[in-house]
């Protein structure tokens, strides 16, 4: 099957280079180009491409608005190009939430210096997302609304009595919050078979993680460690976004973090995250990987392998949507220790690569839709009445 691609960018140079790279592959054909979002919307309607590559910052109509328009009228897998800045990361996350399938950093120097790698990466991504069905009403739109968090106090108490009053107020607010959470999530009888939830994902992962984490209650009984293939500039912005949306606390993992129940730790981009110590006092170790032997930074395999030594079989591991097979070897090590491994089902994946790898290897025991994953996790860890 030949993948028909529409290339959208306000830079004529970048459009030419992307076209050259894609047409190096006989399975890809560029059928058109556009220099702004408005043209992209119109050409998606007339040309009916299999995949669209899209810049974010463009005149007339930006990439995010174009994604929204295309996904509501002529849905098509869209690969975004993004700058490696905090602002670029935020815009990219907005595009993914609007319905884009995946993104790549927009790095002109890589195209010039590492052409072979740039060619393979772009071609592989386009072919991978072209194989997945899309719908007019994207699953991204059904993410639960943001959960209001307790506002931070703007001033410090001035006397000991003020401090006591403030602390009592905080405790009362926390008790009320916990009561609301327990009521909405059902009664909790902690499943002692587990002490940690571990999630690994790649392409399509930002939306999948947001979908799951926004449904977990603030009194979630275990720490959560997450590995998402993502550049270094993106993981901070992504963790901050999730923290603002979720009842559980979400943070970008830092070296030395002690794992705490109800907190989700996102592996920082460009580095490797391992867990050391013992359950109850385990710490995160964030390390640079200069060996050149590991393709992914961060790597699901490395994180899961470290968990097999620290938490052994007391882990519920979940492999979500993503290209390749990262997570298969680490999941096997966890399963050998008695851990439980689940995979996202094919129908709800953006790319059925990583989940397929653990399923075909006989490592995962269940395949679950993205829509049902959070509820399945909560039932498994001990919430009743769901």
From Swiss-Prot:
SUPFAM superfamilies: CheY-like, Methylesterase CheB, C-terminal domain. One of its GO terms (molecular function) is phosphorelay response regulator activity. Its EC number is 3.1.1.61, 3.5.1.44. Residues 133-161 are annotated as: Disordered. The keyword Ligase does not apply. It holds the Pfam family CheB_methylest. InterPro entries: CheB-like, CheB_C, CheY-like_superfamily, Sig_transdc_resp-reg_Me-estase, Sig_transdc_resp-reg_receiver. Residues 190-384 form the CheB-type methylesterase domain. Keywords: Chemotaxis, Cytoplasm, Hydrolase, Phosphoprotein. Residues 4-121 form the Response regulatory domain. It catalyses: [protein]-L-glutamate 5-O-methyl ester + H2O = L-glutamyl-[protein] + methanol + H(+); L-glutaminyl-[protein] + H2O = L-glutamyl-[protein] + NH4(+). The modification 4-aspartylphosphate is found at residue 55. Its main location: cytoplasm. Gene3D superfamilies: 3.40.50.2300, Methylesterase CheB, C-terminal domain. Phosphorylated by CheA. Phosphorylation of the N-terminal regulatory domain activates the methylesterase activity. It is found in: Cytoplasm. SMART domains: REC (SM00448). GO terms for cellular component: cytoplasm. GO terms for biological process: chemotaxis. The active site is at 202, 229, 326. Contains a C-terminal catalytic domain, and an N-terminal region which modulates catalytic activity. Belongs to the CheB family. Involved in chemotaxis. Part of a chemotaxis signal transduction system that modulates chemotaxis in response to various stimuli. Catalyzes the demethylation of specific methylglutamate residues introduced into the chemoreceptors (methyl-accepting chemotaxis proteins or MCP) by CheR. Also mediates the irreversible deamidation of specific glutamine residues to glutamic acid. PANTHER family: PROTEIN-GLUTAMATE METHYLESTERASE/PROTEIN-GLUTAMINE GLUTAMINASE, PROTEIN-GLUTAMATE METHYLESTERASE_PROTEIN-GLUTAMINE GLUTAMINASE 1. This is Protein-glutamate methylesterase/protein-glutamine glutaminase. It comes from Idiomarina loihiensis (strain ATCC BAA-735 / DSM 15497 / L2-TR). The gene is cheB.
